[in-house]
């Protein structure tokens, strides 16, 4: 992981997303170890409060302080209430979680307070309206734009003035290979571009997007994403048409 982090930082990647349960609870310690040799101001670190582990109000402080230690940092640039839905919204209110995170922000331990989301647009509207959030993380890609309410969720965030952090832009890797027919449509439009890069660019082309997350398991995937974003251009009208044509036969 240290070599991967070094390659990312050296090539302009500066937003690193982790969470308490990722990789068998080892993601935060691994990332903390890998990042500690770099100046703290050279990267943005995002982690998340594990909502489903909270059994009482005091657990908020317990997990938050533990996460700072695990990541070997004094503050999180972005801190999210993890996987918010209707049930966890009730917990958020009952345990006064936003108020506690706002206190940590006053203390300089959090720079920006947000949440990641997995529920309906109606629930998203309710959560956005309840507190002065600064950003939100949603699943968005060119399949889920209509199929899974991503368009409606994106527009809710836009209306509330909340920048969107995009997760699953390549839909768990599914949009890295669309099958022979759709792949050929995209290759005719741009012979050099990887199929996955179309998905990354689709998400990054939206104006209210703060950053696009991408889970990468190989240096080749990292290199492809670096190239895509280093040379980034929003999708043109012709490219959008090619993507629509590919989707028709997907």
Model-derived features with residue positions:
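Hydrophobic residues in well-ordered beta-strands that form the structural core
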Residues: 17-18, 47, 166
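N-terminal binding-site loop/beta-alpha segment at the start of enzyme catalytic domains
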Residues: 1-43, 74, 100, 106
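Short beta->alpha linker loops
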Residues: 22, 26, 118-119, 217
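Glycine/proline-rich, positively charged
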Residues: 10, 52-170, 180-184, 190-191, ...
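Structured C-terminal cap/extension of enzyme domains
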Residues: 7-9, 13-14, 33-35, 130-132, ...
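Short catalytic-loop micro-motif centered on adjacent basic/acidic residues
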Residues: 15-22, 111-115, 137-138, 211-213
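Hydrophobic/aromatic residues located in beta-strands of well-ordered beta-sheets
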Residues: 43-45, 113, 164, 212
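Structural motif corresponding to the early beta-alpha repeats
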Residues: 22, 37-61, 82
């Amino acid at each position: 992981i240290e070599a991967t982090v070094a390659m990312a930082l050296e090539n302009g990647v500066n937003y690193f997303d982790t969470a308490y349960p990722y990789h068998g609870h080892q993601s935060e310690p691994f990332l903390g170890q890998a990042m500690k040799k770099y100046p703290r101001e050279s990267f943005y670190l995002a982690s998340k409060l594990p909502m489903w582990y909270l059994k009482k109000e005091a657990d908020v402080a317990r997990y938050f302080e533990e996460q700072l230690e695990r990541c070997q940092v004094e503050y999180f640039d972005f801190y999210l209430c993890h996987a918010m839905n209707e049930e966890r919204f009730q917990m958020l209110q009952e345990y006064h979680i936003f108020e506690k995170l706002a206190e940590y922000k006053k203390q300089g331990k959090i720079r920006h307070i947000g949440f990641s989301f997995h529920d309906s647009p109606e629930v998203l509207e309710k959560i956005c309206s309840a507190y002065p959030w600064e950003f939100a993380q949603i699943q968005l890609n060119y399949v889920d734009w209509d199929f899974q309410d991503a368009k409606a969720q994106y527009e809710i965030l836009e209306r509330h003035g909340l920048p969107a952090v995009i997760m699953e832009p390549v839909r768990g890797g599914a949009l890295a290979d669309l099958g022979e027919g759709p792949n050929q449509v995209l290759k005719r439009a741009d012979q050099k571009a990887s199929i996955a890069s179309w998905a990354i660019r689709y998400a990054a082309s939206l104006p209210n997007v703060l950053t696009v997350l991408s889970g990468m398991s190989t240096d080749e995937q990292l290199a492809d994403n670096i190239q895509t974003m280093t040379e980034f251009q929003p999708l043109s009208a012709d490219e959008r048409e090619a993507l629509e044509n590919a989707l028709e036969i997907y």
